[in-house]
Amino acid sequence: NMKIPFSPPYIDANVINEVVDSLKSGWITTGPKVKALEEEIGKISGVKNVLCINSWTSGAILMLRWLGLQPGDEVIVPAYTYSATAMAVLWAGGKPVMVDSTEDFNISVEGIKNAITEKTKAIIPVDIAGFPCDYDAIMELVKSEKIKALFHATSEIQEKLGRILVLSDSAHSIGAHYG
């Protein structure tokens, strides 16, 4: 009976010391360490405004609400993933539509194609175990004239985007490269 760790956290003495330092400082959410992290991420990524939050789930809820998700709007998610992906859709007021995976455990592009309706506002592919989803094929699909013709914007943000939003979740693929 062999145990193979799927996603073990890296916690050394330095990580522990930083956590203890943060706890002792009295700032555990929006303090100076978070601000420094936001600035560092901004420098590395070349992004002007960075906002760190507590989890990907909270970020997904914010993104879906920013998108203008309404009750009855559909968001395509993989059937093989952590429940937080579908829960974020529910918490944002939408309806998750689950699509099966392929042999690499990532969401099926053909399944996405078959699941898209006039109510589809977003797709949340989830990269599994360091293997990114086929974003080229997903983006080609959502940018195709046939799929864009199905898309009906119901918010200013959706109007500007002009297509279904693709919101990537790479929770178990940090450090993986696509392309």
Language model: regions and residue ranges:
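Phosphate-binding glycine-rich loop
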Residues: 27-74, 88-91, 98, 146, ...
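PLP-dependent aminotransferase-like
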Residues: 65-170
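N-terminal "arm"/small-domain region of PLP-dependent enzymes with the aminotransferase-like
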Residues: 1-28, 32
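Short, polar loop motifs at secondary-structure junctions
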Residues: 171-175
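Short, intrinsically disordered, charge-balanced linker/junction segments flanking boundaries
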Residues: 1, 176-179
